[in-house]
Amino acid sequence: MVGVMTQMPDWLPLGDCELLVVSDGVLWLDAGSVFGVTPRVMWETLVEPLDEEHNLPVGLNCLLVRSQGKVILVETGVGNKATRVPRGCGVAQAGTLLADMARQGIRPEDVDIVINTHLHFDHCGGNTIYRDGKLALTFPRARYFLQKGEWEEANHPNERTRASYLPENLEPLADSRQLELVEGEAEVIKGVRILPAPGHTAHHAIVEVASAGQTALYIGDLVQHHLMLERLAWISSFDELPLVSLETKKRILERAIAENDLLICVHCPPPGLGRLRLVEGKRKWEAL
């Protein structure tokens, strides 16, 4: 995936819904930060090639859902505002979300609902855009759903979290009537739910899409690499609450295996679709 966009799939049926992964490009993250306290010798031969500064390329996979006459967008990537990013994060080919959507004939004004798992710059940067020199909502008709606690944290960050929460991604929402804050589990429309998944942030969430006995989970920053799906103890240094992350991963991944859920992983190589299996007692990520 180094510096190159992988061809994305067509619409995928899920019961009476349709899913499509759309990409905002590629983000480069310091590989040591991605894998946290896990020693380099354990992961360096298993990951994608690093650049000369030891950065790891990761996807920016967003999800379109068509259901019940609605168009739902889960996550918006870094966006195209040339947004500053935290030190150690270099952006390559970011800001491609709208072009990727346009190739499918979907315009910003066609989006009814936007869902953010959390408000770090690489998950909500495309919520806003410069229009006629002023910050505005990218999706002018959409209602924007996210956890109330995440909104409060993003607007009152501490010294550790401040670098990831950027005011330019938040201010137009605060001034609009389109912000929908939820607490805990929340159904956005029938079959589409926001589920708490704390750890990466205290109010991080995932998104469940269920229809006709089939289920997909968009897992946000539950993991930052597919190796973390296979190895529970591998936790990113970006996680605010690593021990909480561990318990959340156990709960969600055990459920995903038991119920054969389709997983959509934002930072896996595009399109980030796959399932987690138990093979001879070990977790195995099977990318689609």
Report residues per predicted region:
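Metallo-beta-lactamase
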Residues: 92-106, 110-122, 129, 138-196, ...
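Short, P/G- and charge-enriched loop/turn segments at secondary-structure junctions
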Residues: 48-53, 132-133, 194
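Residue-level marker for buried hydrophobic side chains located in beta-strands
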Residues: 72-74, 115, 144, 216-218, ...
